Amino acid sequence: MAKKRSSNEAKEVVLFPELEINDRADKSNAGYHPLPSVWEGTDAELLERMLDFYPHVAPKKILDATVNAGRFWVGSTRNVIGMDIDPRHEPDVVGDHTDMPFGNESFDVVVYDPPHIPNQGKDRSKDFNERFGLVLKSSLDEGYNFSHLYPPFCKEAYRVLRRNGILFCKIADYVHGHRFQWAHVEFINAAIAIGFTACDCIVKVRKGPITDPRWKKAHHARRHHCYWLVFRKSKKCE
C-alpha cells in the first residue's frame, strides 16, 4: 500500500519538466545527433555535419562545382574535386558549372554556391559577368539576377550525380535595383523541374553586427542570413 504523504512534507517541484524529458530522450538515443535547422557556425562545419547526416552511405566522391578558393573544405579529409571557371583559383578542374566536363553518374554529392553579388556601379572588379564567367546579362529593369544559371546547372548536376545522390546548394536572396530577388525560391523551382526532390532547408545566420550602409534610406530589411538547400536525386528523401 502506498505511503500517504504528510501534509507537512515538501512536494518536489520541477520548474522545467520539458528539459528533464529531453535529457532522458538524449540518454535513450545516444547514437542520434540531430542537425539544427538554424546554423550559426561556419560553412565548413555545417557541410561536414550534412555530409554525415543526409547521404544513405558515406560519399566516396564529392564535386564542388564552384569551389573558388576552397574555403568549404579547409581541414577536410574528404575526396573532393574542386571545379571553378576562374583558373586563378587553381581548382582541380577549370570548368563551367552549366556544362560540366564529367561523365554521367560520377559523383555521390554535388555542392553549389552560385554568385549572389550583382553588378555594383562602374567598379569592374565587381562585375559578376567577368568574375563568374557569365555569358548572359540579366536586365537592369529586373534588378539584375542570376536565375538564368539555375536550370542549366541543375540539369548538369542531375546528370553527374549517381542514383540517390545529394545536391547541397548555398544560396542567398538579395536586393538589387530596388527589386527583391527570391533566389532560393527560383533555385528550388529549377531543381524540382529537372527531377530533384527538395528535402530540407537550413538557415545559416551570419554572426556579427550588420554593417552601416552608405544609403540614406532603406526599403528592404538587411539580409543577415542565407540558406543551405538539400535535394536528392530520387523520388523520396528518406
Model-predicted segments: where are they?
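Class I S-adenosyl-L-methionine-dependent methyltransferase catalytic core
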Residues: M1-E238
